[in-house]
Amino acid sequence: MTSVQEKTTAEIARQLILGRDLDVAFLIEKKDPATLYFALHSRKDLAPTSAVVRLIQGIYATEPEKSRVLVRNRIYTTAPLTTMDRGMIQVAAKRASEIHGNSELFEIPEKQVDLSETLNGLTSALEYENHPRSTLAGCDDKAWMAFAVQLTRPIQVSRESQPALFLSNRPVAAVLVSKTGELLEWALNTNAVNKTLHAELNLVQSFYRKFKTKLPAGSKLFTTLKPCKMCAAMLFDAAEDMRNFKVALEVIYGEDDPGPNARNTALENFQRQL
C-alpha cells in the first residue's frame, strides 16, 4: 500500500511556484476526489489583480455550481494580503492566511486546477457591438450619473423577464470619464453567478486589459451604488497615484449602501454622493 503524501502549505507553495518569481494562492477541496485549486501571479505585474484575486475569481468562473462552497475553504498565499485581497475575501470568499513557514499538513490531491489565466476571458462592455455611446462630453456630473442609471436598464429588464436567474444581478452601472469629459469605459454588475463581478471591478479589470495602464489621473468614476469594500479597494489600487488619490480619481456614487460591506472602505474619505 502506498503511503499518503503529506506536505506543509509552504512546501505545496514551493512545488507550485517552481523557483519562479511568482506568488501563489491555493485552497484544497477535501471531498472525494480531493482537488487543489491554485493561481499564480507575477510580483512585477501591475494589473489590478493578485494571486488571491485570480484564485477567487477563477473558482467562480470555472465552478459556478459549487463555487460558493469552495471559497469557504481557507485560502493560503505566499503574498502579503493586500486591502484588495481582504476586500474580495470579505465579499466573495471566507478566510485566508499568509504562508510564513506554515506547518499545517495536507494530503496532496492528484487533481490540481490552475486558474491563473481565467480572467483573460472576461470581456469589456465597450467591446460589444451595440454598446451605448455617450455624447455627453463635457457635461456635468448629474448628466453622467443619469447616463449610468440608463445603462442599468438591461439588468432591470432581465430581472423582470427571468427573475430566478437574474435575482442577484442588482442594477448597478459604473462609468469612467476622462478629465476632458470623454467616456473611457463602462460596466455593469454581473454577479448573479460570479460574486466578484461587481460593476466597478468589471470596469477596472476590463480597462486594464485594453490599455495596460492604471486609470488616468484626473478621471471620474460614476457608480450608481456606493462601492463595497471589494470594489473600493480595487479602485484605490487602480488609481494612477494612490498617494494623491483625490487628484488621481474622483469617485461619485448615486444610491447609498447601508450594508456592512460598504462601511469603512478604502474610499471612505475619497468619495462623495451625488
Task: Mark where each language-model region is.
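Zinc-dependent deaminase catalytic domain
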Residues: M1-L274
